């Protein structure tokens, strides 16, 4: 896969593409795509017996403050093949800090072109409380048994904040090209 050829999205930051690294409900393995080769590597085995609460990946051509492309959790129930690209709408952000510093997670849903199931979801507050709690619980605890690693939740932000994070990440990536 040539990541350089994958567009950011149809109308960033409102409509973006996400390259999936870890499918929803998969075994506790953290995969990470090598951004130069496009190859998927095993980053680590997650020590807690937890599964990702959504399909997890990143937006191409972005750069977060942690020097990686911006992370995205796609809220849907169907596991996607690692390496595939899905078009999504950002609906919020989970603001976190971990052993590596600031670590925001964009929360998104598939675009209406892919499925009508999320047509009524406009902001993270439209998700059920149970879904939000699962997402928080996962990201708060998935590093618990890894020596020297930790994660702390700072809070939720709305879709406008998420879009601003994405726009900043796009500009940051352009600045280093």
Swiss-Prot record:
<dbReference type="Pfam" id="PF00719">
    <property type="entry name" value="Pyrophosphatase"/>
</dbReference>
<protein>
    <recommendedName>
        <fullName>Inorganic pyrophosphatase</fullName>
        <ecNumber>3.6.1.1</ecNumber>
    </recommendedName>
</protein>
<feature type="binding site">
    <location>
        <position position="44"/>
    </location>
    <ligand>
        <name>substrate</name>
    </ligand>
</feature>
<feature type="binding site">
    <location>
        <position position="66"/>
    </location>
    <ligand>
        <name>Mg(2+) 1</name>
    </ligand>
</feature>
<feature type="binding site">
    <location>
        <position position="71"/>
    </location>
    <ligand>
        <name>Mg(2+) 1</name>
    </ligand>
</feature>
<feature type="binding site">
    <location>
        <position position="103"/>
    </location>
    <ligand>
        <name>Mg(2+) 1</name>
    </ligand>
</feature>
<comment type="similarity">
    <text>Belongs to the PPase family.</text>
</comment>
<keyword id="KW-0460">Magnesium</keyword>
<feature type="binding site">
    <location>
        <position position="71"/>
    </location>
    <ligand>
        <name>Mg(2+) 2</name>
    </ligand>
</feature>
<dbReference type="InterPro" id="IPR036649">
    <property type="entry name" value="Pyrophosphatase_sf"/>
</dbReference>
<dbReference type="GO" id="GO:0004427">
    <property type="term" value="F:inorganic diphosphate phosphatase activity"/>
</dbReference>
<comment type="subunit">
    <text>Homohexamer.</text>
</comment>
<comment type="function">
    <text>Catalyzes the hydrolysis of inorganic pyrophosphate (PPi) forming two phosphate ions.</text>
</comment>
<feature type="binding site">
    <location>
        <position position="142"/>
    </location>
    <ligand>
        <name>substrate</name>
    </ligand>
</feature>
<dbReference type="GO" id="GO:0005737">
    <property type="term" value="C:cytoplasm"/>
</dbReference>
<keyword id="KW-0378">Hydrolase</keyword>
<feature type="binding site">
    <location>
        <position position="30"/>
    </location>
    <ligand>
        <name>substrate</name>
    </ligand>
</feature>
<dbReference type="InterPro" id="IPR008162">
    <property type="entry name" value="Pyrophosphatase"/>
</dbReference>
<feature type="binding site">
    <location>
        <position position="56"/>
    </location>
    <ligand>
        <name>substrate</name>
    </ligand>
</feature>
<dbReference type="GO" id="GO:0000287">
    <property type="term" value="F:magnesium ion binding"/>
</dbReference>
<keyword id="KW-0963">Cytoplasm</keyword>
<keyword id="KW-0479">Metal-binding</keyword>
<dbReference type="GO" id="GO:0006796">
    <property type="term" value="P:phosphate-containing compound metabolic process"/>
</dbReference>
């Amino acid at each position: 896969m040539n990541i350089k050829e994958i567009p950011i999205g149809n109308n960033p930051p409102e409509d973006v593409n996400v390259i999936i690294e870890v499918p929803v409900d998969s075994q506790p393995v953290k995969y990470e795509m090598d951004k130069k080769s496009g190859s998927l590597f095993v980053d680590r085995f997650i020590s807690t017996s937890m599964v990702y609460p959504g399909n997890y990946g990143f937006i191409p051509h972005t750069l977060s403050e942690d020097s990686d492309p911006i992370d995205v959790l796609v809220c849907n129930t169907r596991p996607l093949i690692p390496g595939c690209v899905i078009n999504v709408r950002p609906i919020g952000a989970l603001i976190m800090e971990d052993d590596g510093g600031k670590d925001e997670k964009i929360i998104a849903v598939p675009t209406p072109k892919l499925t009508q199931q999320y047509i009524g979801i406009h902001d993270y507050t439209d998700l059920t409380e149970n879904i939000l709690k699962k997402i928080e619980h996962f990201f708060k605890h998935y590093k618990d048994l890894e020596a020297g690693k930790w994660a702390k939740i700072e809070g939720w932000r709305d879709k406008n904040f998420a879009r601003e994070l994405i726009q900043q990440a796009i500009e940051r990536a352009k600045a280093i090209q």
